[in-house]
Amino acid sequence: DALENVKIQSGRITGVTDNDSEQTVTLSPALSTTSYSVMLTPVIPTGGIGTNAPIIGIKSGSKTITEFIISIQNNGTTPNIDEIEWLVIKP
């Protein structure tokens, strides 16, 4: 059955810093290929965020079978995004 072959991993990155940064997500166990989808959800602080919303995405060329890199740009200063939830689905 095809559904039995679907692999899902999830987690949360904490301690995202102000301004520009990169966070590496380690996949364990490793996936069989780099053909997987990543969903990122920034966790908004209780008081909201500043006037400039940060840009959050996957760093180009960073997806491997064991990791990928989240790039955070323009994160501003407090309050800012300090956590990101991630979900990986490999069909």
Residue ranges, per PLM feature:
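Extracellular receptor-binding modules and their adjoining Ser/Thr/Gly/Asp/Asn-rich linkers
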Residues: 1-37, 42-48, 54-91
